[in-house]
Amino acid sequence: MTYEQLYKEFHSSKSFQPFIHLDTQPKFAICGLIVTLAVLSSALFAVGSKSSYIKKLFFYTILSVIGSLFAGLTTVFASNSFGVYV
């Protein structure tokens, strides 16, 4: 591809509009961290409850999956706010 083709393609393409702006991502990272800690700590409390083993396993699995999803989102938001764009 020649420079002229690349230049023409660059200027004819649509400008990129981010879904979540970079200036709000640190706020989402902090909120995600709080939610992650709350959900994962409630998963640990669910294990210590006096209910049946199957019920504890079910609640622990659900809460740990939700906590892991929030931990992943928090990692992406935190790394983007430090300038490592994921």
UniProtKB/Swiss-Prot annotation:
GO molecular-function terms, A-Z: structural molecule activity
Membrane protein topology class: Multi-pass membrane protein
Membrane-side (Cytoplasmic) residue stretches: 49-56
Protein name: Dolichyl-diphosphooligosaccharide--protein glycosyltransferase subunit OST5
Keywords: Endoplasmic reticulum, Membrane, Transmembrane, Transmembrane helix
InterPro entries noted in UniProt: TMEM258/Ost5
Biochemical pathway: Protein modification; protein glycosylation
Family recorded in the similarity comment: Belongs to the OST5 family.
Its biological purpose: Subunit of the oligosaccharyl transferase (OST) complex that catalyzes the initial transfer of a defined glycan (Glc(3)Man(9)GlcNAc(2) in eukaryotes) from the lipid carrier dolichol-pyrophosphate to an asparagine residue within an Asn-X-Ser/Thr consensus motif in nascent polypeptide chains, the first step in protein N-glycosylation. N-glycosylation occurs cotranslationally and the complex associates with the Sec61 complex at the channel-forming translocon complex that mediates protein translocation across the endoplasmic reticulum (ER). All subunits are required for a maximal enzyme activity.
Other known facts: Present with 1010 molecules/cell in log phase SD medium.
Cell compartments where the protein resides: Endoplasmic reticulum membrane
CC annotations in GO: endoplasmic reticulum membrane; oligosaccharyltransferase complex
Pfam family, one: Ost5
Organism: Saccharomyces cerevisiae (strain ATCC 204508 / S288c) (Baker's yeast)
Lumenal side: 2-27, 78-86
GO BP of this protein: protein N-linked glycosylation
Domain of life: Eukaryota
Quaternary structure annotation from Swiss-Prot or TrEMBL: Component of the oligosaccharyltransferase (OST) complex, which appears to exist in two assemblies comprising OST1, OST2, OST4, OST5, STT3, SWP1, WPB1, and either OST3 or OST6. OST assembly occurs through the formation of 3 subcomplexes. Subcomplex 1 contains OST1 and OST5, subcomplex 2 contains STT3, OST3, and OST4, and subcomplex 3 contains OST2, WBP1, and SWP1.
Transmembrane regions listed in the UniProt entry: 28-48, 57-77
